[in-house]
Amino acid sequence: MDVTIQHPWFKRPLGPFYPSRLFDQFFGEGLFEYDLLPFLSSTISPYYRQSLFRTVLDSGVSEVRSDRDKFVIFLDVKHFSPEDLTVKVQEDFVEIHGKHNERQDDHGYISREFHRRYRLPSNVDQSALSCSLSADGMLTFSGPKVQSGLDAGHSERAIPVSREEKPSSAPSS
C-alpha cells in the first residue's frame, strides 16, 4: 500500500471561505497583508509566522552582562519616561517595572506595562547601584562587584532613574 506524504503547505484548503489566522494566538500583534488574504497565507506553511522576529525586537529586549568587576543590565524601554519606571532592589533581585496610562499613537490609543526581575550576583555592592535612561530609551542598571570576602549589603531599596541626554552606548543585538 502506498501512502502519499504531503508537505505542510498542502494541508490547508485554499479558498476565501477557509478561516485565516486572524483569530489565532497572535491576536495582539496587529494585522499584516498575508493575514487578510487567506490564499497567500495558506500557500506559506501554516506553522510559519512571519512577524515573530519583529515581535521579539519590539518587546523590550534586555541584555545582561556580568564580568569580573561589574554587573550591567541594558533594557530597551523607549516607550516609557523616567516617571513611568520603578526600579528597586529586594534581597538578591532587581525588579524593573514600567507602566504608562493610555496614550494616543499613530494607530489609536495604547497603554503599556511590563515587569522584569533579574537575580543579582551575590558579590554586587548593592549600596553603589545606579540606573539611568538614555535619550534613545535604553535603561542601564549597573553596579560594581566587591571582593568575595566583603559584605555586599543586601537590603530592600529603591533605585532612582536618572535621564541622560545622549544615546546609549549599549550595542544593539
UniProtKB/Swiss-Prot annotation:
Modified residues (Phosphoserine): S45, S122
Binding site for Zn(2+) 2: H107
Record field: compositional bias (Basic and acidic residues): 153-167
Residues bearing attached sugar chains per UniProt: S162
N-acetylmethionine: residues carrying this PTM: M1
PROSITE patterns reported for this sequence: SHSP (PS01031)
UniProt region (Required for complex formation with BFSP1 and BFSP2), positions on chain: 1-63
Modified residues (N6-acetyllysine): K70, K99
GO cellular component, one term: cytoplasm
Transmembrane keyword on record: no
Domain sHSP: 52-162
Entry's localization field: Cytoplasm; Nucleus
Gene Ontology terms for molecular function: metal ion binding; structural constituent of eye lens; unfolded protein binding
One Pfam family matching this protein: Crystallin
Residue positions, PTM Deamidated asparagine: N101, N123
Chief localization: cytoplasm
Region feature Disordered, mapped onto this chain: 145-173
This protein's record includes keyword Calcium: no
Residues that coordinate or bind Zn(2+) 3: H154
Gene Ontology biological process terms from the UniProt entry: lens development in camera-type eye; negative regulation of apoptotic process; protein refolding; response to heat
Oligomer and partners: Heteromer composed of three CRYAA and one CRYAB subunits. Inter-subunit bridging via zinc ions enhances stability, which is crucial as there is no protein turn over in the lens. Can also form homodimers and homotetramers (dimers of dimers) which serve as the building blocks of homooligomers. Within homooligomers, the zinc-binding motif is created from residues of 3 different molecules. His-100 and Glu-102 from one molecule are ligands of the zinc ion, and His-107 and His-154 residues from additional molecules complete the site with tetrahedral coordination geometry.
Protein task: Contributes to the transparency and refractive index of the lens. Acts as a chaperone, preventing aggregation of various proteins under a wide range of stress conditions. Required for the correct formation of lens intermediate filaments as part of a complex composed of BFSP1, BFSP2 and CRYAA.
Protein name per its UniProtKB record: Alpha-crystallin A chain
Taxon lineage: Eukaryota, Metazoa, Chordata, Craniata, Vertebrata
Name of the coding gene: CRYAA
